[in-house]
């Protein structure tokens, strides 16, 4: 995510310096509280293209319920094929499509359960649970995207439940693999937290009486 979002931000910034405004491509997708919200925040330009040229022509959501579910599955299967002609990509797309369909099917039961438990939709704890669940579901689907073949996928899925060897050295090696020390990782996490609290995405550089010209605008 950092690599993908990073170089698109560089492209947006370079274009802005030349007076060209490009659309935002990522909007903190990993704070999404549902898979549907995740796709409103992830790779926005590609998602918009699929919505305009595949989802809407098929009827979008303005059709019978089951046709809408069919449309969602078609869009995500095509999205998987767009990333590569491999069954792992197709499965990745199918999983995300299934996430969305199941989410729609369970919407009313979820609302009834929350009402029964007297849990408010605005509860901070509920927001945290939804973000955690969405993050886990997205990361699980990335396994299918990452696998080089169906056989590799089988190995990766088995390793989720077997041969756990979590140690200090393992955790340290994970951060070092990303080019970070443990302290550097903690500083990065703290910085991201502060940026989200400040909602830095809404900050603007504006020209005023001083004649300053905005260079980057998010």
Regions found by a protein language model. Give the residues of each.
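Membrane-embedded transmembrane alpha-helical bundles that form the catalytic cores
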Residues: 1-191, 196-218
